[in-house]
């Protein structure tokens, strides 16, 4: 884990400038979540509108919305693909994203252009540097 001030950055993940992370699993699917920075900036989460299983998304498309006490924020797809699973525990317990944003993923995607799109994402070290610049 890399620490940048009060924020934690988990190594082995890919990150976007919008503070989503992507984890490539051994079977080639991708888990998507939000970073520690994102959950701290949002504050206490009240609701996660999960995407529909079967939804096709392109990199940068809105994957879902998260409501906090401060605002409603959009979560963008870090890679293109089909939503094949969602973390249903978040429907009843959105605060799981506050408690551990790296263990509590939002959706699992079957990617369609993974190799190319991973090149456009940041590794943990690059994301930590990005956070230092904010």
From Swiss-Prot:
GO BP annotations, alphabetical order: glycine decarboxylation via glycine cleavage system
Post-translational modification N6-lipoyllysine, affected residues: 70
Domain Lipoyl-binding, chain residue ranges per copy: 29-110
Cofactor: (R)-lipoate
Function: The glycine cleavage system catalyzes the degradation of glycine. The H protein shuttles the methylamine group of glycine from the P protein to the T protein.
Cofactor remark from the record: Binds 1 lipoyl cofactor covalently.
PROSITE patterns reported for this sequence: BIOTINYL_LIPOYL, LIPOYL
Gene3D superfamilies in the record: 2.40.50.100
Name recorded for this polypeptide: Probable glycine cleavage system H protein
GO cellular component terms listed in the entry, alphabetical order: glycine cleavage complex
Protein family membership: Belongs to the GcvH family.
């Amino acid at each position: 884990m890399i620490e940048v001030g009060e924020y934690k950055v988990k190594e082995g993940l890919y990150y976007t400038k919008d503070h989503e992370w992507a984890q490539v699993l051994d079977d080639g699917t991708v888990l998507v979540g939000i970073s520690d920075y994102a959950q701290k900036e949002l504050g206490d989460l009240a609701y996660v509108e999960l995407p529909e299983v079967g939804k096709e998304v392109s990199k940068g498309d809105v994957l879902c919305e998260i409501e906090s006490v401060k605002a409603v924020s959009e979560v963008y797809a870090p890679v293109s693909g089909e939503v094949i699973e969602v973390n249903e525990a978040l429907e009843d317990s959105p605060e799981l994203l506050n408690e551990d944003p790296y263990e509590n993923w939002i959706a699992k995607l079957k990617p369609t252009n993974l190799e190319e799109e991973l090149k456009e994402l940041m590794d943990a070290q690059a994301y930590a540097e990005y956070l230092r610049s904010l």
